[in-house]
Protein backbone atom coordinates (compact mmCIF):
# COMPACT_ATOMS: atom_id res chain seq x y z
CA UNK A 1 0.00 0.00 0.00
CA UNK A 2 1.44 3.39 -0.95
CA UNK A 3 1.97 5.38 2.25
CA UNK A 4 -0.68 3.48 4.17
CA UNK A 5 0.12 0.74 6.61
CA UNK A 6 -1.27 -2.70 5.97
CA UNK A 7 -3.30 -3.58 9.04
CA UNK A 8 -4.70 -7.01 8.25
CA UNK A 9 -8.23 -8.21 7.65
CA UNK A 10 -9.88 -7.73 11.02
CA UNK A 11 -11.96 -4.64 11.80
CA UNK A 12 -9.89 -1.96 13.54
CA UNK A 13 -11.32 0.32 16.20
CA UNK A 14 -10.11 3.92 16.20
CA UNK A 15 -11.10 5.97 19.24
CA UNK A 16 -11.01 9.73 18.62
CA UNK A 17 -11.47 12.57 21.10
CA UNK A 18 -12.08 16.12 19.83
CA UNK A 19 -13.84 18.65 22.04
CA UNK A 20 -13.71 21.84 19.95
CA UNK A 21 -15.09 22.77 16.53
CA UNK A 22 -11.65 22.98 14.91
CA UNK A 23 -10.71 19.56 16.25
CA UNK A 24 -14.08 18.19 15.13
CA UNK A 25 -13.27 19.24 11.55
CA UNK A 26 -9.84 17.61 11.73
CA UNK A 27 -11.35 14.45 13.18
CA UNK A 28 -13.94 14.19 10.43
CA UNK A 29 -11.31 14.57 7.71
CA UNK A 30 -9.13 11.94 9.39
CA UNK A 31 -12.09 9.55 9.58
CA UNK A 32 -12.71 9.97 5.85
CA UNK A 33 -9.08 9.24 5.01
CA UNK A 34 -8.92 6.20 7.28
CA UNK A 35 -12.12 4.85 5.76
CA UNK A 36 -10.68 5.42 2.27
CA UNK A 37 -7.73 3.22 3.24
CA UNK A 38 -9.48 0.56 5.33
CA UNK A 39 -13.01 0.54 3.89
CA UNK A 40 -15.33 -1.56 6.02
CA UNK A 41 -12.42 -2.74 8.17
CA UNK A 42 -12.54 0.28 10.47
CA UNK A 43 -15.02 1.45 13.08
CA UNK A 44 -14.96 4.69 15.02
CA UNK A 45 -15.88 5.59 18.57
CA UNK A 46 -15.21 8.59 20.75
CA UNK A 47 -16.07 12.23 21.33
CA UNK A 48 -16.76 14.73 18.57
CA UNK A 49 -19.10 17.31 17.14
CA UNK A 50 -21.35 17.72 14.12
CA UNK A 51 -18.64 17.06 11.52
CA UNK A 52 -17.56 13.77 13.07
CA UNK A 53 -21.21 12.82 13.56
CA UNK A 54 -21.61 13.30 9.82
CA UNK A 55 -18.93 10.65 9.36
CA UNK A 56 -20.80 8.23 11.59
CA UNK A 57 -19.43 8.94 15.08
CA UNK A 58 -21.88 8.65 17.98
CA UNK A 59 -20.29 11.01 20.49
CA UNK A 60 -19.92 9.90 24.09
CA UNK A 61 -21.21 13.33 25.16
CA UNK A 62 -21.98 16.66 23.41
CA UNK A 63 -18.78 18.67 23.00
CA UNK A 64 -20.76 21.80 23.88
CA UNK A 65 -20.43 20.69 27.50
CA UNK A 66 -16.77 21.71 27.28
CA UNK A 67 -17.16 24.99 25.37
CA UNK A 68 -15.65 27.14 28.11
CA UNK A 69 -12.77 29.58 28.20
CA UNK A 70 -10.96 31.34 30.96
CA UNK A 71 -9.45 30.22 34.25
CA UNK A 72 -12.42 31.33 36.34
CA UNK A 73 -14.88 29.42 34.15
CA UNK A 74 -12.73 26.29 34.37
CA UNK A 75 -12.60 26.49 38.17
CA UNK A 76 -16.37 26.90 38.41
CA UNK A 77 -17.01 23.85 36.23
CA UNK A 78 -14.12 21.71 37.40
CA UNK A 79 -16.26 18.93 38.95
CA UNK A 80 -18.12 18.50 35.65
CA UNK A 81 -14.87 18.51 33.66
CA UNK A 82 -13.27 15.88 35.90
CA UNK A 83 -16.40 13.74 35.60
CA UNK A 84 -16.21 13.89 31.79
CA UNK A 85 -12.50 13.00 31.88
CA UNK A 86 -13.24 9.91 33.98
CA UNK A 87 -16.13 9.02 31.69
CA UNK A 88 -13.94 9.30 28.59
CA UNK A 89 -11.15 7.20 30.15
CA UNK A 90 -13.58 4.46 31.13
CA UNK A 91 -15.11 4.48 27.64
CA UNK A 92 -11.70 4.12 25.97
CA UNK A 93 -10.74 1.22 28.22
CA UNK A 94 -14.08 -0.49 27.61
CA UNK A 95 -13.75 -0.08 23.83
CA UNK A 96 -10.19 -1.51 23.83
CA UNK A 97 -9.38 0.36 20.60
CA UNK A 98 -6.48 -0.38 18.29
CA UNK A 99 -5.46 3.26 18.68
CA UNK A 100 -6.50 6.40 20.55
CA UNK A 101 -6.26 9.69 18.64
CA UNK A 102 -6.55 12.81 20.79
CA UNK A 103 -7.19 16.00 18.83
CA UNK A 104 -6.16 19.39 20.23
CA UNK A 105 -7.77 20.64 23.51
CA UNK A 106 -4.77 19.43 25.56
CA UNK A 107 -6.19 20.47 28.92
CA UNK A 108 -8.84 17.79 28.43
CA UNK A 109 -7.43 15.26 25.97
CA UNK A 110 -4.01 14.90 27.59
CA UNK A 111 -5.57 14.17 30.96
CA UNK A 112 -7.53 11.40 29.28
CA UNK A 113 -4.44 10.08 27.48
CA UNK A 114 -2.31 9.98 30.64
CA UNK A 115 -4.92 8.00 32.53
CA UNK A 116 -5.46 5.58 29.63
CA UNK A 117 -1.71 4.95 29.38
CA UNK A 118 -1.49 4.31 33.13
CA UNK A 119 -4.33 1.80 33.08
CA UNK A 120 -3.67 0.10 29.72
CA UNK A 121 -0.19 0.74 28.26
CA UNK A 122 -0.99 -1.48 25.26
CA UNK A 123 -3.20 1.16 23.57
CA UNK A 124 -1.10 3.33 21.21
CA UNK A 125 -1.82 7.05 21.42
CA UNK A 126 -1.43 9.70 18.71
CA UNK A 127 -1.77 13.41 19.46
CA UNK A 128 -3.19 15.32 16.47
CA UNK A 129 -2.32 19.04 16.89
CA UNK A 130 0.64 19.78 19.10
CA UNK A 131 0.20 21.73 22.30
CA UNK A 132 2.11 25.02 22.14
CA UNK A 133 5.17 23.61 23.94
CA UNK A 134 7.32 26.04 21.94
CA UNK A 135 5.52 29.01 23.54
CA UNK A 136 4.85 27.98 27.12
CA UNK A 137 5.47 25.11 29.54
CA UNK A 138 8.12 23.49 27.31
CA UNK A 139 8.55 20.72 29.88
CA UNK A 140 5.29 19.26 28.61
CA UNK A 141 7.08 17.94 25.52
CA UNK A 142 9.33 15.64 27.54
CA UNK A 143 6.43 14.62 29.80
CA UNK A 144 4.46 13.56 26.71
CA UNK A 145 7.01 10.80 26.09
CA UNK A 146 5.24 8.89 28.83
CA UNK A 147 1.84 8.79 27.17
CA UNK A 148 2.04 9.88 23.51
CA UNK A 149 3.58 7.69 20.79
CA UNK A 150 3.48 10.23 17.95
CA UNK A 151 2.56 13.89 17.50
CA UNK A 152 0.95 15.11 14.27
CA UNK A 153 1.99 18.75 13.88
CA UNK A 154 0.11 21.43 11.95
CA UNK A 155 3.05 23.84 11.88
CA UNK A 156 6.32 23.17 10.03
CA UNK A 157 8.65 24.27 12.83
CA UNK A 158 7.15 21.97 15.47
CA UNK A 159 9.06 18.71 14.74
CA UNK A 160 12.37 20.49 15.35
CA UNK A 161 10.99 21.88 18.61
CA UNK A 162 10.07 18.39 19.80
CA UNK A 163 13.56 17.14 19.01
CA UNK A 164 15.07 20.09 20.88
CA UNK A 165 12.78 19.55 23.87
CA UNK A 166 13.30 15.75 23.83
CA UNK A 167 9.64 14.98 23.29
CA UNK A 168 7.95 12.11 21.42
CA UNK A 169 8.35 11.59 17.65
CA UNK A 170 6.67 14.43 15.78
CA UNK A 171 5.78 14.74 12.09
CA UNK A 172 4.58 17.77 10.17
CA UNK A 173 1.39 16.74 8.39
CA UNK A 174 0.30 20.19 7.23
CA UNK A 175 -2.15 22.82 8.35
CA UNK A 176 -5.77 22.31 7.22
CA UNK A 177 -5.71 25.83 5.78
CA UNK A 178 -3.37 24.55 3.05
CA UNK A 179 -6.41 22.83 1.53
CA UNK A 180 -8.27 26.15 1.41
CA UNK A 181 -5.82 28.49 -0.31
CA UNK A 182 -8.16 28.97 -3.28
CA UNK A 183 -11.11 30.09 -1.16
CA UNK A 184 -8.97 32.79 0.49
CA UNK A 185 -7.33 34.26 -2.61
CA UNK A 186 -9.08 37.02 -4.63
CA UNK A 187 -10.01 36.77 -8.29
CA UNK A 188 -9.47 39.76 -10.60
CA UNK A 189 -12.70 41.54 -9.60
CA UNK A 190 -12.07 40.97 -5.90
CA UNK A 191 -8.49 42.20 -6.23
CA UNK A 192 -9.81 45.36 -7.89
CA UNK A 193 -12.15 45.93 -4.92
CA UNK A 194 -9.28 45.28 -2.53
CA UNK A 195 -7.36 48.13 -4.16
CA UNK A 196 -10.35 50.48 -4.52
CA UNK A 197 -11.56 53.23 -2.19
CA UNK A 198 -12.72 53.20 0.48
CA UNK A 199 -10.52 50.28 1.59
CA UNK A 200 -12.22 47.39 3.37
CA UNK A 201 -11.04 47.04 6.97
CA UNK A 202 -11.84 43.70 8.58
CA UNK A 203 -12.69 43.78 12.28
CA UNK A 204 -12.17 40.42 13.99
CA UNK A 205 -12.74 40.57 17.77
CA UNK A 206 -12.58 36.81 18.33
CA UNK A 207 -14.40 33.53 17.84
CA UNK A 208 -15.48 32.97 21.45
CA UNK A 209 -17.89 34.88 23.63
CA UNK A 210 -15.30 35.99 26.15
CA UNK A 211 -12.99 37.17 23.35
CA UNK A 212 -15.70 39.34 21.83
CA UNK A 213 -16.43 40.84 25.24
CA UNK A 214 -12.74 41.56 25.90
CA UNK A 215 -12.04 43.21 22.53
CA UNK A 216 -15.28 44.92 21.48
CA UNK A 217 -14.80 48.23 23.29
CA UNK A 218 -11.20 48.80 22.20
CA UNK A 219 -11.96 47.84 18.60
CA UNK A 220 -15.06 50.04 18.44
CA UNK A 221 -13.18 53.03 19.88
CA UNK A 222 -10.37 52.47 17.38
CA UNK A 223 -12.78 52.68 14.45
CA UNK A 224 -14.30 55.87 15.88
CA UNK A 225 -10.89 57.49 16.29
CA UNK A 226 -9.92 56.59 12.73
CA UNK A 227 -13.13 58.19 11.48
CA UNK A 228 -12.49 61.36 13.51
CA UNK A 229 -9.02 61.59 11.98
CA UNK A 230 -10.58 61.58 8.51
CA UNK A 231 -9.42 58.09 7.56
CA UNK A 232 -11.73 56.58 4.93
CA UNK A 233 -12.60 52.88 5.26
CA UNK A 234 -15.46 50.39 5.13
CA UNK A 235 -15.58 48.23 8.27
CA UNK A 236 -16.65 44.61 7.82
CA UNK A 237 -17.03 42.26 10.78
CA UNK A 238 -17.26 38.53 9.98
CA UNK A 239 -18.73 36.30 12.68
CA UNK A 240 -20.31 32.90 13.21
CA UNK A 241 -24.01 32.07 13.55
CA UNK A 242 -23.71 31.18 17.25
CA UNK A 243 -22.02 34.52 18.02
CA UNK A 244 -24.14 36.75 15.80
CA UNK A 245 -26.50 37.91 18.56
CA UNK A 246 -23.66 38.71 20.96
CA UNK A 247 -21.71 40.56 18.25
CA UNK A 248 -24.69 42.66 17.17
CA UNK A 249 -25.33 43.63 20.79
CA UNK A 250 -21.65 44.43 21.34
CA UNK A 251 -21.39 46.75 18.31
CA UNK A 252 -24.78 48.43 18.76
CA UNK A 253 -23.17 51.34 20.60
CA UNK A 254 -20.23 51.74 18.20
CA UNK A 255 -20.04 55.08 16.45
CA UNK A 256 -18.84 53.35 13.28
CA UNK A 257 -21.26 50.56 12.42
CA UNK A 258 -19.50 47.67 10.65
CA UNK A 259 -21.20 45.55 8.03
CA UNK A 260 -21.67 42.21 9.77
CA UNK A 261 -21.33 39.06 7.67
CA UNK A 262 -22.23 35.65 9.07
CA UNK A 263 -20.86 32.23 8.22
CA UNK A 264 -17.67 30.80 6.74
CA UNK A 265 -18.53 31.45 3.09
CA UNK A 266 -19.26 35.15 3.63
CA UNK A 267 -16.22 35.48 5.88
CA UNK A 268 -13.93 34.24 3.14
CA UNK A 269 -15.59 36.51 0.60
CA UNK A 270 -14.80 39.42 2.93
CA UNK A 271 -11.19 38.27 3.30
CA UNK A 272 -10.80 38.26 -0.48
CA UNK A 273 -11.67 41.97 -0.81
CA UNK A 274 -10.09 43.23 2.42
CA UNK A 275 -7.27 45.77 2.36
CA UNK A 276 -6.30 45.43 6.04
CA UNK A 277 -7.52 43.90 9.30
CA UNK A 278 -7.71 44.56 13.02
CA UNK A 279 -7.79 41.10 14.57
CA UNK A 280 -7.69 39.30 17.87
CA UNK A 281 -4.54 37.17 17.82
CA UNK A 282 -5.10 33.50 16.97
CA UNK A 283 -5.44 31.12 14.01
CA UNK A 284 -7.17 33.91 12.08
CA UNK A 285 -3.77 35.60 11.66
CA UNK A 286 -2.63 32.69 9.50
CA UNK A 287 -5.85 32.86 7.48
CA UNK A 288 -5.29 36.58 6.89
CA UNK A 289 -1.67 36.01 5.89
CA UNK A 290 -2.71 33.34 3.37
CA UNK A 291 -5.35 35.73 2.03
CA UNK A 292 -2.71 38.47 1.72
CA UNK A 293 -4.37 40.87 4.17
CA UNK A 294 -1.96 42.98 6.27
CA UNK A 295 -3.08 43.15 9.88
CA UNK A 296 -2.76 44.63 13.33
CA UNK A 297 -3.31 42.06 16.08
CA UNK A 298 -4.43 42.52 19.65
CA UNK A 299 -5.12 40.36 22.65
CA UNK A 300 -6.95 41.06 25.90
CA UNK A 301 -7.95 38.53 28.55
CA UNK A 302 -9.04 38.39 32.16
CA UNK A 303 -6.56 39.50 34.79
CA UNK A 304 -6.06 35.98 36.17
CA UNK A 305 -5.31 34.51 32.73
CA UNK A 306 -2.84 37.29 31.94
CA UNK A 307 -1.13 36.94 35.34
CA UNK A 308 -0.61 33.23 34.70
CA UNK A 309 0.47 33.70 31.08
CA UNK A 310 3.13 36.26 31.94
CA UNK A 311 4.76 33.78 34.28
CA UNK A 312 4.81 30.78 31.96
CA UNK A 313 4.86 32.06 28.36
CA UNK A 314 8.29 32.24 26.74
CA UNK A 315 9.26 35.74 25.54
CA UNK A 316 8.69 36.53 21.89
CA UNK A 317 5.81 36.75 19.48
CA UNK A 318 2.61 34.81 20.05
CA UNK A 319 1.26 35.58 16.58
CA UNK A 320 0.84 32.35 14.63
CA UNK A 321 1.56 33.95 11.25
CA UNK A 322 4.79 35.50 12.57
CA UNK A 323 5.89 32.13 13.95
CA UNK A 324 5.25 30.39 10.63
CA UNK A 325 7.08 33.08 8.64
CA UNK A 326 9.93 33.24 11.14
CA UNK A 327 9.73 37.03 11.12
CA UNK A 328 7.89 39.47 13.41
CA UNK A 329 6.32 41.50 10.62
CA UNK A 330 2.86 41.69 12.22
CA UNK A 331 2.49 44.05 15.20
CA UNK A 332 0.79 42.80 18.36
CA UNK A 333 -0.77 44.80 21.18
CA UNK A 334 -1.34 42.77 24.33
CA UNK A 335 -3.51 43.65 27.35
CA UNK A 336 -2.69 47.23 28.47
CA UNK A 337 -1.29 47.95 24.99
CA UNK A 338 -4.62 46.97 23.39
CA UNK A 339 -5.91 50.55 23.44
CA UNK A 340 -6.95 52.99 20.70
CA UNK A 341 -3.90 55.21 21.29
CA UNK A 342 -1.72 52.38 20.00
CA UNK A 343 -4.11 50.57 17.66
CA UNK A 344 -5.14 53.66 15.65
CA UNK A 345 -1.70 54.60 14.25
CA UNK A 346 -0.88 50.95 13.54
CA UNK A 347 -4.11 50.39 11.59
CA UNK A 348 -3.83 53.74 9.79
CA UNK A 349 -0.33 52.75 8.67
CA UNK A 350 -1.69 49.66 6.89
CA UNK A 351 -4.45 51.49 5.02
CA UNK A 352 -1.88 53.31 2.88
CA UNK A 353 0.99 52.12 0.70
CA UNK A 354 3.53 52.16 3.51
CA UNK A 355 6.76 50.26 4.30
CA UNK A 356 4.94 48.44 7.11
CA UNK A 357 2.28 47.22 4.68
CA UNK A 358 4.83 46.19 2.06
CA UNK A 359 6.88 44.32 4.64
CA UNK A 360 3.90 42.21 5.68
CA UNK A 361 2.98 41.44 2.07
CA UNK A 362 6.56 40.34 1.35
CA UNK A 363 6.38 37.96 4.30
CA UNK A 364 3.02 36.57 3.19
CA UNK A 365 4.49 35.71 -0.22
CA UNK A 366 6.58 32.99 1.46
CA UNK A 367 3.66 31.28 3.20
CA UNK A 368 2.84 28.77 0.44
CA UNK A 369 6.34 27.32 0.31
CA UNK A 370 6.68 27.23 4.10
CA UNK A 371 3.40 25.36 4.62
CA UNK A 372 3.70 23.06 1.59
CA UNK A 373 3.02 19.35 2.10
CA UNK A 374 3.59 18.35 -1.51
CA UNK A 375 0.87 16.40 -3.27
CA UNK A 376 -0.68 14.81 -0.17
CA UNK A 377 -3.35 16.49 1.94
CA UNK A 378 -2.77 17.06 5.67
CA UNK A 379 -5.52 14.60 6.59
CA UNK A 380 -4.06 12.01 4.21
CA UNK A 381 -0.62 12.34 5.79
CA UNK A 382 -2.18 12.12 9.23
CA UNK A 383 -4.07 8.94 8.31
CA UNK A 384 -0.92 7.24 7.03
CA UNK A 385 0.94 7.96 10.27
CA UNK A 386 -1.99 6.77 12.39
CA UNK A 387 -2.01 3.50 10.45
CA UNK A 388 1.76 3.16 10.78
CA UNK A 389 1.63 3.65 14.56
CA UNK A 390 -1.22 1.14 14.74
CA UNK A 391 0.76 -1.38 12.70
CA UNK A 392 3.85 -1.13 14.90
CA UNK A 393 1.99 -1.17 18.23
Curated annotation (Swiss-Prot):
GO terms for molecular function: lipid-A-disaccharide synthase activity; phospholipid binding. SUPFAM superfamilies: UDP-Glycosyltransferase/glycogen phosphorylase (SSF53756). Pathway: Bacterial outer membrane biogenesis; LPS lipid A biosynthesis. It is an enzyme of class 2 (transferase). It holds the Pfam family LpxB. One of its GO terms (cellular component) is membrane. InterPro entries: Glyco_trans_19. It catalyses: a lipid X + a UDP-2-N,3-O-bis[(3R)-3-hydroxyacyl]-alpha-D-glucosamine = a lipid A disaccharide + UDP + H(+). The keyword Transferase applies. Keywords: Glycosyltransferase, Lipid A biosynthesis, Lipid biosynthesis, Lipid metabolism, Transferase. Its EC number is 2.4.1.182. GO terms for biological process: lipid A biosynthetic process. Belongs to the LpxB family. Condensation of UDP-2,3-diacylglucosamine and 2,3-diacylglucosamine-1-phosphate to form lipid A disaccharide, a precursor of lipid A, a phosphorylated glycolipid that anchors the lipopolysaccharide to the outer membrane of the cell. This is Lipid-A-disaccharide synthase. It comes from Rhodopseudomonas palustris (strain ATCC BAA-98 / CGA009).
